[in-house]
Amino acid sequence: DCQREITIDTHANILYRNGNWKEYDLLKLNLTSFFTLQQMITKVDPRYSHFLTSILNSNNEIPETIKILSWNYDTQLEMAYGKIIKSDDIYSVLDKMKIHSKFLAVSHSNTNPNIFKLNGSIFYYYANGFRKFYLNSGLTENLNQSNLERLIDNHNNYFDLISKEKMDYSSALSYAFEEEKKEDQYIHK
């Protein structure tokens, strides 16, 4: 069906409007896996590191006076920041960068986000809270057999869970047309 539409976003919008949650969640899973694999292949664009190092203060924080809007699904900003602070831990990077998106809020202690990801990110989060789950578990940018196998295993496991409607977490990808999901739209175990 996606081949008949002009863009993947149009196809996603049609699935969303028709309440085809299973197909919609599978599309988001496929996009998440694609972008994760693409990042493993192409690595971090050096422009992100250059941009961040030009705005970070001496504590490697984005100043409160700077707000960033991003419509990218990928985690290039997060990966570049992780490289700067020498951290592969996605949880600490998200909190330190003060990232907010429709479905992936900054930690409760952070009330003044610096980065607003308008289309979300290639993450999964648990339906009942703020626990973030990264498809590839870290910010690694290396394509090796172990990481590729983990990505494929995770993709296949999530695909099975979504297909069986037994998944209790949801994609952090979002579209402008998408409202926050209601409790009955989540797929629960």
Task: Please report, for each region that a protein language model flagged, where it lies by residue.
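Conserved catalytic alpha/beta core of Sir2/sirtuin-type deacylases, generalized to analogous enzyme cores
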Residues: 1-189
